[in-house]
């Protein structure tokens, strides 16, 4: 069996984090999914869906892909901490293209950074509902 891709979603208990993890959870045969969340409400929401949370400090260094699904106002400070923990060759997906234009993201030369927007074509082409 092929090695599963390890994907960690930072902000997994929020609105966008929930949408992303709901879709990724459908592919557990090929994806090992880490739900990273710090808010009590977000952690409770993840547990209600039947999943456990993993601290970012544990999940990020082991991840192939990290998806940053956090509120715009904290993206700069969160990205600094996350990017420091990334393993060379890993990829950070950012759901806020304005943050990249505004140069609010921490970057590294040995990692890949992808910016997408949730209101544009989905990163999951099999979506049939809005949540």
What function would you assign to each model-found segment?
Residues 1-49:
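NAD(P)+-binding Rossmann beta1-loop-alpha1 motif at the extreme N-terminus of oxidoreductases
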Residues 6, 33-34, 52, 65-67, ...:
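Structural motif
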Residues 12, 37-38, 70, 95-97, ...:
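Fold-independent oxyanion-binding glycine-rich loops
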Residues 22-25, 48-51, 81-84, 106-109, ...:
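Short, glycine/charged-enriched secondary-structure capping and boundary segments
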Residues 50-63:
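Short acidic low-complexity segments
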Residues 60-104:
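Rossmann-fold NAD(P) dinucleotide-binding segment
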